Amino acid sequence: MTDFILNAQARTDLGKGASRRLRHSANIPAVVYGGDKEAQSLTIVAKEIAKLFENEAAFSHVIELNVDGAKQNVVVKAMQRHPAKGFIMHADFVRVVAGQKLTAKVPVHFVGEEAPIKKGGEISHVVSEIEVSCEAKDLPEFIEVDLSKAEVGTIIHLSDLKAPKGVEFVALAHGDDKAVANVHAPRVAAEAAEGAAE
């Protein structure tokens, strides 16, 4: 059982023109795939999906998707937003199958930022989400990045983070130890020091 429920209708009218007509009627196109079943094109009421994803946790939780009354558990795989206005234009969902791993993007929560700031550091968040691979039951709501012990000059990489039990960082599994955040000296101070040295 999930706290996140979304209603949808099967869609047969496909193509760019059809998608445009959908958006004009306050609906959005979507697709659900995976789980050894055919991909299915969907129509979702724009207001419903916008309301659901006002809650950040919906991005990293199992969603009960009701397609014409038939229920299936899914996670959001990708979402396309309007570049200027930010509203949702299209969504991709993946069916959840018990015992099978899925990949999903999970939000990053930064904590302990006060400590490096007090030491004169400025913090740059390099990522806002991390792609993980795990079973649906292990899908974390977010990944916590603790900056309380970070010094000026510190770069936090994926390998510095503790993955929750049963969870794997996709980039790290492919040998890509991405930077997540860094603590650097304030730019103004650095420029002043450079000027004094000249």
From Swiss-Prot:
Keyword Ribonucleoprotein: yes or no?
yes
> A GO biological process this protein is involved in?
translation
Q: Which InterPro entries match?
A: Rbsml_bL25/Gln-tRNA_synth_N (IPR020056), Ribosomal_bL25/Gln-tRNA_synth (IPR011035), Ribosomal_bL25_b-dom (IPR020057), Ribosomal_bL25_C (IPR037121), Ribosomal_bL25_long (IPR001021), Ribosomal_bL25_short (IPR020055), Ribosomal_L25_dom (IPR029751), Ribosomal_uL5_bac-type (IPR020930)
Keywords in alphabetical order: Ribonucleoprotein, Ribosomal protein, RNA-binding, rRNA-binding
Q: Does the keyword S-adenosyl-L-methionine apply?
A: no
| Gene3D superfamilies xref list | Ribosomal protein L25, beta domain, Ribosomal Protein L25, Chain P
One of the record's GO molecular function terms? structural constituent of ribosome
A GO CC term?
cytosolic large ribosomal subunit
| Entries under NCBIfam families matching the protein | bL25_bact_ctc, PRK05618.1-2, PRK05618.1-5, PRK05943.1
- Assembly and partners? Part of the 50S ribosomal subunit; part of the 5S rRNA/L5/L18/L25 subcomplex. Contacts the 5S rRNA. Binds to the 5S rRNA independently of L5 and L18.
Instruction: Sum up the protein's function in the record's words.
Output: This is one of the proteins that binds to the 5S RNA in the ribosome where it forms part of the central protuberance.
Q: Tell me which family the UniProt entry assigns to this protein.
A: Belongs to the bacterial ribosomal protein bL25 family. CTC subfamily.
What's the protein called, per UniProt? Answer: Large ribosomal subunit protein bL25
